[in-house]
Design a protein with these regions (language model features):
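Glycine-rich phosphate-binding loops of nucleotide-dependent enzymes
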Residues: 1-184
């Protein structure tokens, strides 16, 4: 830190105080259009997840809706059930009660693969530990959730050329930086 000065709060504006804190003028108000959320895309009703090790519920009777166009954040102190709730929604953890509806379809008892087919995705909080296989190439990591789809296999065998074609497309589309392309 660097000393920027001393001011009397009652004689100082928010703009002046923020300028002293940041070192430049800061726009304190953002002009934006009012949000117009769409239809309900995720409906969570009374979700409960029991933790057998702790012999109590880690998530109890959680209910909320997410509308098209909304971004929802789950916040709280570590250990208060956010991870378990996400695991329950994505199928990684079994619910002991409640219902999950995605785009009007009850997915409560669906497998992870079926939830993925239905359009649900999950970005884990630790991407390196749970989001990819570090020993796999970039192209193999890019098809982890879809290797079973017909376009990537034939007769039960992975079609490497199709996997590479798909991963090269994603690398170009999202400007992915890698040492040697998709085989990295």
């Amino acid at each position: 830190g660097k000393y920027m000065g001393t001011v009397d709060i009652k004689d100082t504006t928010k703009e002046e105080l923020s300028r002293m804190m940041v070192g430049r003028d800061v726009q304190l108000q953002v002009d934006k259009k009012p949000a117009h959320p769409g239809d309900v895309v995720l409906d969570v009703e009374g979700v409960t997840i029991h933790n057998d090790q702790r012999k109590k519920d880690s998530v109890k009777d959680v209910t909320f809706q997410v509308h098209a166009g909304e971004i929802v954040c789950l916040a709280g102190i570590e250990g208060n059930g956010q991870t378990e709730l996400v695991y329950g929604l994505t199928g990684l953890e079994k619910l002991s009660g409640g219902k999950i509806t995605l785009d009007g379809k009850d997915i409560t008892r669906e497998s992870i693969r079926q939830r993925s087919k239905d359009g649900m995705s999950h970005i884990p909080e630790d991407r390196h530990k749970h989001g990819l296989v570090l020993d796999y190439s970039l192209e193999n990591n890019m098809v982890l959730q879809r290797y079973w789809q017909p376009e990537f296999q034939k007769g039960g065998f992975i079609q490497s050329d199709k996997v590479r074609e798909y991963s090269d497309k994603l690398i170009a589309q999202y400007d992915v930086r890698s040492g040697q392309g998709s085989s990295t």
